[in-house]
Each structure stands twice: as C-alpha cells, then as structure tokens.
Design a protein with these regions (language model features):
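His/Asp/Glu-rich, glycine-adjacent segments
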Residues: 1-163
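Extracellular loop and loop/strand-boundary signature of outer-membrane beta-barrel proteins
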Residues: 169-173
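Metal-dependent active-site segment of extracytoplasmic phospho-/sulfohydrolases and closely related
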Residues: 175-188
Length: 188
C-alpha cells in the first residue's frame, strides 16, 4: 500500500500489487469503504484464484504515523458448486450480483465493523433474492438472515440503559434492525 498526502495531510491509502506497480488496485479514505479490490490469492492447494475484497480505513494519522485498516474476507470469484443448490446458481449469482462481503466476527472491540459488514452482506442478499425471484421459477420463498440473531447474542446485555456500554451498543443494535428493514423494503 501507499499513503497519499493531500496538502501535506494523509487521508488516503492506495493498494498496489507490488512495490513498483504502475496502477493501484484499490484506494480508501478515512471512514470509508473501498470499491471492490480484485486480486489473486493462493488457495490451500497452492492454486492462484481470483478474489475480491473491500478495505475499510478506520484511522490514518494526518502525519501518516498511525494506520488502522480493515480488510474484509476475500470472496472467490469462481463459485464453489457445493455451496448452492442447484450447483450452477452460485456462479450466476456472482455474475449478476457481484461479490459478497462475509459478515465479520471481529468481536466487541470492532462491533462497528460487524454491523457494517452485515449491512453490506444483507444488501447483497437482497439483490440476490430479487434476482432469483425475478429470473427463476419458484413456488415458495423463504429466507433466514442471521444478522439480528447474531447482534442480539453479542450486544443484548449492553443495550439496557444501565449498561456502561449502552451509548455505544444501543445505536449499533438499532442499525441491525434498520438493515433488515432495508432488505424487506428492497423485496417489496
């Protein structure tokens, strides 16, 4: 990566494949998510596979002395045929809906990243559901999204007003419910 100063202040990180690469693969500014970064990674057998991931820049000191960067899990761009039924639908969903961000399980210190990755994940799920409902025959639609369940397990003890962490966690829990409302709105 490379820190890019603007008028002597660092606000942007650019990601390059190599130190002397001419073009950057992705960039991100403080407080933002990057667009998809397309890359290649070795799988467990040593085979190079195309993947996509996103960056989230939490902090970048104005003088460049401190950096806190989150890299999402990588989404393989070749669908695993064992993940979907029918098998061929996985690649079709990737082709029509793009890569998916898996929800982070980074824990309480990074609860905000958990909520943000769930929001990205749920947005993809809504797009995938709409694609399937519009383009495939179906008799029954059923969907189980775990975001609120996970959020309640992680935060429920801290969303009572007596909790010293209430001010941090209550707004996050509300965002999870808003994310599910947005999914429902996209499906209507």
């Amino acid at each position: 990566g490379l820190l890019v100063p603007e008028n002597g202040v660092y606000r942007t990180v650019k990601l390059y494949a190599a130190k002397k690469a001419d073009k950057f693969m992705g960039e991100v500014q403080v407080g933002q998510w990057s667009d998809w970064v397309y890359d290649n990674m070795l799988d467990d057998k040593g085979v190079k596979r195309p993947v996509a991931y996103k960056l989230r820049l939490f902090e970048l000191a104005e003088d460049g002395s401190k950096l806190e960067l989150y890299v999402s899990s990588a989404c393989r761009l070749e669908a695993d045929p064992n993940y979907t039924n029918p098998r061929e639908i996985g690649q079709e969903l990737l082709d029509h809906c793009g890569p998916i961000v898996n929800a982070s399980n980074a824990g309480r210190p990074y609860a905000e990243i958990g909520q943000e990755t769930w929001a990205l994940n749920l947005d993809w799920c809504a797009d995938a559901i709409n694609y399937l409902l519009d383009n495939k025959p179906w008799d029954l639609f059923y969907c189980h999204l775990h975001a609120i369940d996970v959020a309640n397990h992680n935060m429920l003890s801290d969303v009572v007003p007596e909790s010293p962490r209430y001010e941090r966690f209550y707004p996050l829990l509300v965002k999870y419910y808003e994310n599910i409302d947005q999914v429902l709105g996209k499906l209507m």
